[in-house]
Curated annotation (Swiss-Prot):
Protein name per Swiss-Prot or TrEMBL: L-lactate dehydrogenase
Function: Catalyzes the conversion of L-lactate to pyruvate. Is coupled to the respiratory chain.
Species this chain originates from: Chromohalobacter salexigens (strain ATCC BAA-138 / DSM 3043 / CIP 106854 / NCIMB 13768 / 1H11)
Catalytic residues of the enzyme: H275
Intracellular or extracellular location(s): Cell inner membrane
Length: 392
């Protein structure tokens, strides 16, 4: 199969992966309306084409929290990434480091913090959930510090798990899930040999390290389900600050007032995100939410964004609407599942080339030159209202 776009990696991953893993990454909450609108709304943003601007000295380089980035992109935290390729978090982190961008390790990764941090030379980012077990939270924060992690991504949009119907249909959860997953693995021998057999252990490295015993997939579902904390509030941010003095990003902001609260409570950055449409179906797409949030807090903290980004053009659109850096989730997981580290590195090369084309044809020589003037109407908020279908 010829891979020329990130969508090609999705098709390749679907063939290689057992259904329970493919749909775990690919699916969303409820009827998946928000999942689809993330992509559709972003693709509907119109950019101004500018010509004869001498674009021979174009640069994608930027900086975030004093850390140089080769382009305004980072790999997002994705749970169980180590199930998509052998020691998948390590492979993805190496690919990101080789391309000069950050990798964010999930709390519920297969590979533990120390293993991933020791595999790369640039600082690792780490993502943390608020869980009932505060002892675990303190434990992983201490491990993150010891491993040289500089930036913490604090996920706040999971006080309860989303209703993901695909997981029940595919065997990730639900009745006879273990048997269904085993049968799927047998019928996908390439994955079974590379990851199922040689990618062991398949436990949650950070959780197992804390509990002192292996945490298999069934344990993961039960442990995480019992540890989500609906009592989460801004006071938890203060508690975490007692243990973390580095840059802290709040992930899961969709409303300008929440963004203002993040500023008031001392966050260094936010991620405008609906969790890739995996939590609450029916909330606005990130493309719809971003302009108003940027108007509210731009310049007060760093604005990151995710959800719906499928190519370098989408990155340019998000930056023009007010984001500083974009997180990639599903896009890199498909590439990781297809070709491991090499696949993720190639995906990032595709994104870089697509960004260069888009910036050349919009007349933006640097990331700083991308802004509301890059949009057709000259206003991010007006542009999105005019370019998207009224039915959405």
């Amino acid at each position: 199969m010829i891979i020329s776009a990130s969508t090609d990696y999705r098709h390749a991953a679907k063939r290689r992966l057992p259904p329970f893993l493919f749909h775990y990454a690919d699916g969303g909450a409820y009827a998946e309306h928000t999942l689809r609108r993330n992509v559709e709304d972003l693709a509907g943003i119109a950019l101004r084409q500018r010509v004869l601007k001498d674009m021979s000295h174009l640069s994608l380089e930027t900086e975030l929290f004093g850390e140089p980035l080769a382009m305004p992109v980072a790999l997002a935290p994705v749970g169980l990434a180590g199930m998509y390729a052998r020691r998948g978090e390590v492979q993805a982190a190496r690919a990101a480091a080789s391309k000069g961008i950050p990798f964010t390790l999930s709390t519920v990764s297969v590979c533990p913090i120390a293993e991933v941090a020791s595999a790369i030379e640039r600082p690792l980012w780490f993502q943390l959930y608020v869980l009932r077990d505060r002892g675990f939270m303190k434990h992983v924060l201490e491990r993150a510090k010891a491993a040289g992690v500089k930036t913490l991504v604090f996920t706040v949009d999971m006080p309860v798990p989303g209703a993901r119907y695909r997981d029940a249909h595919s065997g990730m959860s639900g009745k006879h899930g273990g048997l269904r997953r085993m049968l799927q693995a047998v019928t996908h021998p390439s994955w079974a040999w590379d990851v199922g057999l040689h990618g062991r252990p398949h436990d949650l490295g950070n959780v197992s390290d804390y509990r002192g015993q292996p945490t298999e997939l069934e344990d993961y579902i039960a442990w995480l389900g019992n540890n989500f904390d609906p009592s989460i509030s801004w006071k938890d941010l203060e508690w975490i600050r007692e243990f973390w003095d580095g840059p802290m990003i709040i992930k899961g902001i969709l409303d300008p007032e929440d963004a203002r609260d993040a500023v008031r409570f001392g966050a260094d950055g936010i991620v405008v995100s609906n969790h890739g449409g995996r939590q609450l179906d029916g909330v606005p797409s990130t493309a719809r939410a971003l302009p108003a949030i940027a108007d509210a807090v731009k310049g007060d903290l760093a604005i990151l964004a995710d959800s719906g980004v499928r190519n370098g053009l989408d990155v340019v659109r998000m930056i023009a609407m007010g984001a500083d850096t974009i997180l990639l989730g599903r896009a890199y997981i498909y590439a990781l599942a297809t070709a491991g580290e090499a696949g993720v590195a190639h995906l990032l090369e595709l994104f870089e080339k697509e960004m260069r084309v888009a910036m050349t044809l919009t007349g933006a020589r640097s990331i700083a030159e991308l802004g509301s003037d890059s949009l057709v109407t000259g206003s991010a908020a007006a542009s999105i209202e005019r370019t998207l279908s009224p039915s959405l």
